UniProtKB/Swiss-Prot annotation:
Ribosomal protein recorded as keyword: yes
HAMAP family, alphabetized: Ribosomal_bL36 (MF_00251)
Family matches, as Pfam families: Ribosomal_L36 (PF00444)
Keyword Transferase (UniProt): no
Any single GO BP term: translation
Alphabetical list of InterPro entries matching this protein: Ribosomal_bL36, Ribosomal_bL36_sp
Keywords: Chloroplast, Plastid, Ribonucleoprotein, Ribosomal protein
UniProt similarity note: Belongs to the bacterial ribosomal protein bL36 family.
Name the UniProt record assigns to this protein: Large ribosomal subunit protein bL36c
Principal cellular location given in the protein's record: plastid
Record organism: Anthoceros angustus
Length: 37
């Protein structure tokens, strides 16, 4: 899980979602997981 100021999709499998007022990226590749904070 990477915590970044700006999250973005890295590949076509990445999906932007909102959980508990935070923007997150979930993907089939665990390296692409990101959280905004």
């Amino acid at each position: 899980m990477k915590i970044r100021a700006s999250v973005r999709k890295i590949c076509e499998n990445c999906r932007l979602i909102r959980r508990r007022r935070r923007v997150m990226v979930v993907c089939s590749n665990p390296k692409h997981k990101q959280k905004q904070g």
